From Swiss-Prot:
Topology of the protein relative to the lipid bilayer: Multi-pass membrane protein
Disulfide bonds listed in the record: 5-178, 13-88, 96-182
Originating organism: Pan troglodytes (Chimpanzee)
Domain of life, per lineage: Eukaryota
CDD domains per UniProt: 7tmA_TAAR1
Protein name: Trace amine-associated receptor 1
């Protein structure tokens, strides 16, 4: 007999008939992803919060993004894990809307943060003399507010007003909606709107800004090289070191952006294309793409650990319990702060 998610069979979603071994493997993999996401981003949050040397405008923006990446491990992934492994939703229709809204909000907020970080890096590399005047703590607070509020209004407004399936109500209620399910469904209009708002527009801004930074940094490197060849070694070497550090930061954040695009691009492309293809993408594939997107929140701290020496030193201090020592917050994580 085919398993169902609800007692009333004629309105119930169909439960998958995977073996217990398959389910156990899926749960183990997803628990590992969740724990890695939580621990990695928590280390970033604690590091920036604890060490006073890291209290810079850019790092507070990174702190906020780490919080955005941390929250899916608490609020989204555990419930998505059950839905993916069982193909059933046991938490009620209201919580389904809350879960879906939170999921969309946090994924959108992550790329909003990356967009603002790219702008921050643009001024740090391309206009360093006026960087601290232009990107002060007030500007960072505005960036953080926009990065959280706009995705929240967009996601919760769309889901709770049921605008996500507006124009495709007949398809949704006849072929998708069932008791014990929590499918992420978009009509043609809402799919395009979500793609543009959460992915394409902010992603395009990032790509354009980083390309502009690359061109300017490349030109700066050429000028510094020419100046050094004219024996202006003292001052120019200092400027060269500073610009080298900025370019390294740009490269690191560019990799973070690239990881985001690689992780979320398949999901957003399917989201915008599926309604025009008459919803041919199976739910299982959609689940896989969603979890592939979640991996973005898992990978970001790994990028920090690989490229940021201050992150590795902070991690060592945490592992050995040194952050509990007196005045540990004033510990020097590096000799010279970058912007």
């Amino acid at each position: 007999m085919m398993p169902f998610c609800h007692n009333i069979i004629n309105i119930s979603c169909v439960k998958n008939n995977w073996s217990n071994d398959v389910r156990a493997s899926l749960y183990s993999l997803m628990v590992l992803i969740i724990l890695t996401t939580l621990v990695g981003n928590l280390i970033v949050i604690v590091s920036i919060s604890h060490f006073k040397e890291l209290h810079t405008p850019t790092n507070w923006l990174i702190h906020s993004m780490a919080t955005v990446d941390f929250l899916p491990g608490c609020l989204v992934m555990p419930y998505s894990m059950v839905r993916s492994a069982e193909h059933c939703w046991y938490f009620g229709e209201v919580f389904c809307k809350i879960h879906t809204s939170t999921d969309i909000m946090l994924s959108s907020a992550s790329i909003f943060h990356l967009s603002f970080i790219s702008i921050d890096r643009y001024y740090a590399v391309c206009d360093p003399l006026r960087y601290k005047a232009k990107i002060n703590i007030l500007v960072i607070c505005v960036m953080i507010f926009i990065s959280w509020s706009v995705p929240a209004v967009f996601a919760f407004g769309m889901i709770f007003l049921e605008l996500n399936f507006k124009g495709a109500e007949e398809i949704y209620y006849k072929h998708v909606h069932c008791r014990g399910g929590c499918s992420v469904f978009f009509s043609k209009i809402s799919g395009v709107l979500t793609f543009m708002t959460s992915f394409y527009i902010p992603g395009s801004i990032m790509l354009c800004v980083y390309y502009r930074i690359y061109l300017i940094a490349k030109e700066q490197a050429r000028l510094i090289n020419d100046a050094n060849q004219k024996l202006q070694i003292g001052l120019e070497m200092k400027n060269g070191i500073s610009q080298s550090k900025e370019r390294k930061a740009v490269k690191t954040l560019g990799i973070v952006m690239g990881v985001f695009l690689i992780c979320w691009c398949p999901f957003f492309i399917c989201t915008v294309m599926d309604p025009f293809l008459h919803y041919i993408i199976p739910p299982t594939l959609n689940d896989v793409l969603i979890w592939f997107g979640y991996l973005n929140s898992t990978f970001n701290p790994m990028v920090y650990a690989f490229f940021y020496p201050w992150f590795r030193k902070a991690l060592k201090m945490m592992l050995f319990g040194k952050i509990f020592q007196k005045d540990s917050s004033r510990c020097k994580l590096f000799l010279e702060l970058s912007s």
